[in-house]
Regions:
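Nucleotide-sugar donor-binding/catalytic module of glycosyltransferases
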Residues: 1-223, 230-231, 243, 249
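Low-complexity, charge- and small-residue-enriched intrinsically disordered regions
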Residues: 241-259
């Protein structure tokens, strides 16, 4: 029921009539861009090219939705728009339910503040899964090479870590956990990464975790260089002046007692 959006649909060599159904449903609606790949590109490369096709503004919100999953209800986009306006955030994660069990997914939960403060996301357990949303200005600052594996190819598995870690590190306290269920993760799909090659998945995860961290883009006033801004220096100077007056009075009174 939220109308102000643009949707890039990419058919990655599907083997059924998905493309024909999608084409019929979005025909004539300029909000949709429908792409039919002629070669298999897999998730991350499709997301990378899909964002480019969307041609977003810096403040636009990007949402990733896997083709075999779905939103939990028709109000998700409205919910997210209101949430971003209220929280003034740059990135959100969570929450999702597993299909067909209906259980809440375990890989989306609140990141501890100490992890945010130290940007130690890569050392902490993975907990920023579906639903993943972020401002384009964060995405645009990710180095392309950090989306590529040691062979120079887009990550085939654990690809969400390759872009979420950099954006979490850049966003800092501008990231938010959403407790409400917005996403349904289809565990019935036999092609889920952990079902295909779990050993390879773990290997790629470690490779991504070992990459360099990104600097925070948030001015939270806690870094040393921020303490020298004119307004903070003014406060510091006043405190020093007050302490100096107290010290002089203390010395004067002490000397008076000695006399």
């Amino acid at each position: 029921n939220y109308l102000n959006f643009k949707c890039v649909l990419i058919d990655d060599i599907s083997t059924d009539n998905t493309y024909e159904i999608a084409k019929k449903m979005v025909s004539g609606d300029e909000r949709f861009i429908l792409v039919k790949n002629t070669e298999k590109k897999l998730a991350l490369k499709n997301i990378y090219e899909g964002v480019q096709l969307a041609n977003p503004n810096q403040e636009d919100i990007i949402i990733t939705l896997d083709g075999d999953d779905w939103f939990s209800n028709s109000n998700v986009l409205t919910y997210l728009n209101d949430f971003y306006n209220k929280e003034d955030c740059w990135l959100t994660y969570g929450s999702y339910a597993e299909f067909p069990s209906g259980k809440k997914g375990k890989f989306a939960k609140q990141i501890p503040q100490r992890v945010v403060d130290t940007r130690s996301y890569r050392e902490y357990e993975w907990c920023t899964s579906h639903l993943r949303t972020f401002k384009y200005h964060l995405w645009s600052k990710i180095k392309k090479e950090d989306l590529l594996d040691s062979q120079g190819e887009f990550y085939r598995m654990t690809w969400d870590l390759s872009f979420m870690f950099p954006m979490l590190e850049m966003a800092g306290n501008k990231s938010r956990y959403i407790q409400d269920i917005l996403y349904v993760y289809n565990l019935d799909n036999p092609l889920n990464d952990h079902k295909v090659d779990n050993i390879y998945q773990v290997k790629l995860e470690q490779e991504i975790r070992n990459k360099n961290k990104y600097e925070s883009l948030v001015d939270d006033g806690t870094r040393p260089e921020h303490l020298l801004r004119h307004n903070r220096f003014d406060i510091a100077a006043k405190l020093i002046f007050i302490k100096d007056k107290i010290l002089k009075r203390y010395i004067s009174e002490t000397l008076g007692c000695l006399e």
